[in-house]
Amino acid sequence: MPERHTLPARYYTEPSWYAAEMERIFAQMWLAGCRLDQIDARGAFQRRDVAGASVLLVGDGAGGARAFYNVCRHRGTRLCDVESGVFAGSIQCPYHGWTYDLQGRLIGAPQMDEVEGFARAGYPLHGVACAVWDGHVFFNLSDSPAPLREQLGDLPARFAPWRMDELRMVHRVEYDVKANWKLIVQNYNECLHCPIIHPLLNRMHQYLGAANVPSTETYCGGAMGLKDGVETLSVDGRRRRAPLPGLGPEDQQLVNYYAIYPNFLLTLHPDYMLTVTIWPQSPDHTRLIAEWHFHPDEIVRPGFVSGDAIEFWDVTNREDWAISERSQQGISSRGYTPGPYSNREQLLWDFDQFILKRAQGDQRGREEEVGSQGDQGGQGAKN
């Protein structure tokens, strides 16, 4: 590709730009929230906070999910301050006791029967659009979102062999990273750093052998082959679990890495799935939830182990988060100017274009502003 450069510092540091991303990207697109098996019991819930909203994802006990804003319709009190749990048949506000059923309908409002004309039917919880893809529960803060399938494109067909809806979560780790959320996505989408940052991962992968698919406006990614003798990504490269049932021989030799914009990193292995959801907190602070998912037939098998896969990615993740924090430190300093992308960083350029198109709706400024930044050494950060 022609010489192209990274984004100026302000896209990683300025509160005003961060606010634009939250409003025009995170509040408009479908976000990966949790897995359906985490809320499969009636009343089970997960809480997610993003883009100035707090959302409750609630299981209906019949294989479905609903989403509501975590706000009482009486005087705006937050209904729930824990991240997960089970509502015992209803959701009650801790302030004045307004109570809602699991469909969000107001069923109790103390003393409101004294108010002339008050009707409980007029004050349900505000709903949030919710949809499920292969066991992944998504929500959308927009008032009139396009169907989830439009954002996913061809991914449901591409990943059908993994039968992700059958997989079950075994382990979860939360990380707080002192870096802009975009640095997390960019780091995920290239492996030029692997020989330097990831000694364990580099022993497993042909790091220059990525086969990326053409990026779309909603995702980017591709597959990387395992080295000879490596069966999966684990601490020693051995696979201690059977391959996922739907995979053919070719897929059993690959690991698929896909960033589904804006907050979902999906990594599919021959024998398990790793998901990372991204929850921006501020321009330089991101909360990440990593979860490891395995096939239920393996989970119940005597001798089942998952620690080899969990340790592998926990080590690798922490290496990635540490270098992302150092990137944030450098980009935030006076010495930073945009640097040139290599030909193997096309996905990062594609992601930059997604950000600019969605958050400001005009890509011309990007070309004009950073197209010739490579000769500006010695100057201060371009903010």
Language model features: what each stretch is:
Residues 361-365, 371-380:
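Small-residue-biased low-complexity repeat regions
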Residues 7-50:
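Non-catalytic accessory segments flanking enzyme active sites
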Residues 38-143, 149-157:
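Rieske [2Fe-2S] iron-sulfur-binding domain
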Residues 40, 58-59, 64, 70, ...:
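C-terminal catalytic domain of Rieske-type non-heme iron oxygenases
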Residues 33, 79, 106, 201, ...:
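Short clusters of hydrophobic/aromatic residues that line enzyme substrate/ligand-binding pockets
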Residues 1-9, 165:
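Short, contiguous pre-domain boundary segments
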Residues 28-38, 109-114, 257-262:
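Short Pro/Gly-enriched beta-strand edge/turn motifs at strand-loop
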